[in-house]
């Protein structure tokens, strides 16, 4: 088979950037990414392991758990690959040639980076629909989502393939100089099918769902607050706060996609990173901060610890 593309030029690291400033950027970035990823891990462990029986009937937490998996992957690959090699210039001449010669690792990183971001968009659509259904049809909400939860989880995993298929079939991935380090790019098998185009489509679609569903949810929370359980109400407000972080990510993506004169702006590039970082780690921080249920389960009070200790002591006394 003949490939109709020209090889990009070999990597030449840009030495005009200050190593100390770029490394400081990296340290500042991981100072919030890694704690946010750890918080996602705690929440995921609580939902799936330590309090599995408590959460297994919750459709919202099932969707949030899958969203947390995407967030953890994003934090891991960005902290220890993407941002590391982008913002630490001394690594560029050492590591860059290796990734230039082998395109498998850059391809895996690039694919995971795009797939998980699209997955988070789809998961967010499912979460705002879940909360809207809760306030619109509180009586039938449980029945509806018992049928929809598994379907939603499959869709969250599969639907991003609609935006990553060209990455899978693309013949060449390579590194290019950026911010003193290097970033990943690729030769598109289908020239028009860029990853940024698909990300814009997914994000803007999620933006429409977010605006409509969140508006309806907020209106119903205000008008029918006495008919909604306090636990469900707390989740609704948590999701509204998460939606605000998504709106910031969507706005920066839309500006980057449709403002051609803005694409070369370092400020917008940084703002886009920060906005999606806020959406990635912010969901865990917001759920922990605004939801007393999840906060109490991750950080139980001394009274709860004493109660668990007494139960364990009683159980042990019966087994001896």
From Swiss-Prot:
Gene Ontology MF, one: transmembrane signaling receptor activity
Top-level lineage group: Eukaryota
Entry keywords, A to Z: Membrane, Transmembrane, Transmembrane helix
Residue spans crossing the bilayer: 29-49, 57-77, 85-105, 151-171, 197-217, 240-260, 268-288
Localization annotation: Membrane
GO terms (BP aspect): sensory perception of chemical stimulus
Membrane topology: Multi-pass membrane protein
Record flagged with keyword S-adenosyl-L-methionine: no
Any Gene Ontology CC annotation: membrane
InterPro entries registered for this protein in UniProt: 7TM_GPCR_serpentine_rcpt_Srg, Nematode_SR-like
Family that this chain belongs to: Belongs to the nematode receptor-like protein srg family.
Protein's recorded name: Serpentine receptor class gamma-15
Organism per entry: Caenorhabditis elegans
Gene (name only): srg-15
């Amino acid at each position: 088979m003949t490939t109709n593309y020209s090889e990009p030029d070999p990597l030449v690291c840009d030495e005009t950037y200050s190593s100390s400033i770029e490394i400081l950027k990296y340290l500042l970035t991981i100072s919030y990414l890694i704690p946010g990823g750890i918080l996602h891990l705690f929440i995921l462990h609580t939902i799936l392991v330590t309090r599995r029986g408590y959460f297994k009937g919750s459709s919202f937490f099932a969707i949030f758990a899958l969203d947390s998996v995407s967030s953890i992957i994003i934090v891991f690959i960005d902290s220890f690959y993407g941002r590391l090699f982008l913002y630490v210039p001394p690594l560029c001449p050492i590591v860059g040639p290796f990734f230039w010669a082998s395109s498998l690792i850059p391809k895996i990183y690039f694919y995971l980076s795009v797939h998980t971001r699209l997955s988070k968009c789809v998961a967010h659509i499912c979460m705002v629909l879940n909360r809207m259904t809760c306030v619109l049809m509180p009586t039938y909400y449980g029945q509806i989502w018992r049928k929809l939860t598994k379907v939603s989880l499959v869709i969250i995993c599969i639907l991003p393939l609609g935006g990553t298929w060209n990455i899978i079939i693309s013949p060449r991935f390579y590194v290019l100089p950026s911010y003193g380090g290097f970033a990943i790019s690729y030769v598109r098998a289908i020239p028009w099918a860029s990853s940024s185009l698909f990300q814009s489509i997914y994000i803007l679609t999620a933006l429409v769902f977010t605006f409509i569903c969140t508006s309806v949810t907020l209106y119903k929370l205000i008008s029918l607050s006495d008919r909604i359980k306090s636990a469900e109400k707390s989740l609704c407000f948590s999701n509204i706060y998460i939606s605000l972080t998504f709106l910031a990510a969507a706005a920066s993506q839309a500006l980057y996609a449709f403002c051609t004169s803005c694409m070369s702006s370092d400020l917008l590039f940084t703002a886009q990173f920060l906005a999606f970082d806020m959406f990635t780690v912010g969901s865990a921080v917001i759920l922990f901060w605004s939801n007393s249920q999840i906060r109490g389960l991750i950080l139980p009070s001394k009274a709860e610890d004493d109660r668990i200790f007494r139960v364990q002591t009683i159980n042990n006394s019966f087994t001896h």
